[in-house]
């Protein structure tokens, strides 16, 4: 889904850039319309004018393509660091990639030059020399479509960025159902697996170690799920997957599990089980303590029910869990240790020293449970960084596109502005008049971008069982932010036209 989103965004930004380039080329060509008229009066055909326009477009696109390749090569280390990947230039040297680049370049050249070449080459020499701005039919509609498309891109991308940020914050602050802070775990290797109680007692002599527990798997990498559980009045066609977890009686203290019914397992309860709320809801009873479940030919008495916890992922669906005491060496693969908030580094050094003395082959690998769950957000963090980068590009493209539009408007309405100023109209009124179409285009774009981004991000959020609700306020914020950037860009360029001396504006060649 993320690859599809990136592809769609890349195409959207490329199309927006092409539309903006058309706007800029059109604005520039209007300044050369008399030059084209002179060419035609000297014998140039319409095809010659089209070739000239396309030659200019091709040169600009090729220079931009070469610059893009160089920027990509220079920025690749930064990009790899940004997304924690190792992409090299050999990937771009692939024959298929090169062919795709060439095709994109040719399409960009073809689309970028078609409007100015077709429209601005059709005038007669007399019309061109006189400056036939008013003869461009439907030009305003086309340029409005360009501006609206750029607004749609910017608003949609910024909305996506805000939604991703909100989802990441939601997952970061999600209640996992247990305490992951300052809990480290390590694998019990070699001799350590045969004497877990001795290791635990040794570690607990340190006052900065609050609790320790042997476990079959850490909650961040839970395995061993299976079917085959039986209970009274269970439907014959219902056989859910249940995660089977082993932990000693101190597990409830180490991870601060919350019991909602009964109590946690005690020493000697080898034929008892504790289940989570999700498993209890699948069973469907109103009371569980003391009742019996069966699996693999054994009966297990339910000692209690604990509140649901997140395992293996942050945004995944809650899974049914059954907890047993370790049975000999089975279920004692790891040990989890809860550390007090003071002197954490010294406590970690103490743990490593003791384990190295007991098992020389110990790899010195202590893993914070909190780091595991933080790492689970790496794909979302990478997506957030890339979408933010795309959004920055989109807003930059928006600013360039508006520059082209204002260049065109200022060129076309120079005399109109001069007449209005000579009749006493204030600069503020002139600026407001020229801003009005921009604001209208922004509002129309917001009406289109909002359902589009809402639909796409709703599709993306389906990746998560635990997710935020999309709020209309996000799209309002995105629209206001984009409009603010747009208005600032326009005001920077429009002030020159509005403050120009009306005598200079009305002077004809």
Regions found by a protein language model. Name each.
Residues 19-60, 122-133, 400-441, 499-508:
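Intracellular coupling helices
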Residues 1-12, 30-32, 45, 75-103, ...:
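Membrane-helix entry/capping segments
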Residues 241-319:
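Hydrophobic secondary-structure segments that place a key small or acidic residue at a functional site
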Residues 58-125, 166, 436-499:
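Small-residue-rich transmembrane alpha-helices
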Residues 361-450, 457-460:
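C-terminal transmembrane helical bundles of large multi-pass transporters
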Residues 1, 194-213, 277-281, 295-384, ...:
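"Rare, low-scoring activations can occur
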């Amino acid at each position: 889904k993320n690859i599809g989103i990136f592809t769609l965004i890349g195409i959207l930004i490329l199309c927006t850039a092409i539309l903006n380039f058309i706007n800029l080329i059109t604005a520039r060509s209007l300044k050369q319309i008399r030059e084209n008229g002179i060419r035609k009066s000297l014998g140039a055909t319409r095809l010659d004018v089209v070739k000239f326009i396309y030659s200019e477009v091709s040169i600009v696109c090729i220079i931009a393509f070469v610059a893009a390749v160089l920027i990509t090569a220079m920025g690749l280390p930064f990009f790899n660091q940004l997304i924690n990947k190792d992409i090299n230039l050999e990937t771009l040297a692939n024959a298929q990639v090169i062919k795709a680049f060439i095709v994109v370049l040719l399409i960009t050249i073809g689309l970028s030059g078609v409007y100015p070449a077709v429209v601005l080459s059709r005038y007669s020499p007399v019309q061109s020399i006189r400056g036939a701005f008013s003869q461009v039919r439907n030009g305003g509609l086309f340029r409005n479509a360009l501006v609206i498309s750029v607004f749609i891109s910017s608003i949609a991308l910024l909305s996506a960025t805000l939604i991703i940020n909100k989802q990441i914050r939601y997952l970061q602050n999600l209640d996992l159902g247990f305490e992951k802070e300052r809990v480290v775990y390590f694998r019990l290797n070699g001799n350590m697996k045969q004497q877990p109680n001795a290791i635990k007692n040794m570690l607990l002599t340190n006052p900065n170690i609050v609790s320790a527990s042997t476990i079959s798997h850490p909650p961040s990498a839970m395995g061993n799920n299976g079917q085959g559980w039986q209970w009274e009045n269970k439907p014959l066609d219902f056989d859910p997957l249940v995660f089977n977890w082993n932990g000693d009686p101190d597990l409830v203290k180490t991870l601060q599990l919350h019991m909602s019914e009964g109590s946690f397992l005690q020493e000697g309860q080898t034929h008892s089980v504790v289940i989570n709320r999700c498993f209890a809801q699948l069973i469907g009873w109103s009371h569980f303590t003391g009742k019996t479940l069966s699996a693999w030919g054994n009966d297990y008495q339910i000692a209690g029910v604990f509140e649901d916890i997140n395992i293996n992922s942050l945004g995944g669906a809650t899974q049914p869990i059954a907890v047993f005491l370790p049975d000999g060496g089975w279920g004692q693969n790891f040990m989890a240790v809860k550390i007090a908030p003071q002197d954490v580094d010294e406590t970690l050094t103490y743990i490593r020293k003791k384990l190295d003395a007991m098992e020389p082959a110990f790899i010195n690998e202590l893993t914070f449970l909190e780091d595991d769950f933080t790492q689970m957000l790496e794909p979302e963090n990478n997506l957030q960084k890339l979408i933010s980068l795309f959004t920055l590009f989109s807003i930059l493209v928006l600013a360039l596109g508006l520059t082209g539009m204002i260049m065109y408007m200022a060129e076309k309405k120079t005399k109109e502005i001069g007449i209005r100023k000579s009749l006493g109209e204030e600069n503020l009124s002139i600026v407001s008049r020229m801003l009005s179409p921009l604001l209208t285009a922004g509002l129309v774009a917001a009406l289109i971008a909002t359902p589009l981004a809402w639909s796409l991000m709703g599709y993306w959020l389906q990746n998560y069982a635990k997710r935020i609700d999309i709020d209309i306020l996000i799209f309002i914020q995105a629209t206001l932010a984009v409009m603010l950037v747009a208005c600032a860009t326009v005001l920077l360029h429009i002030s020159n036209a509005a403050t120009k001396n009306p005598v200079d504006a009305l002077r004809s060649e």
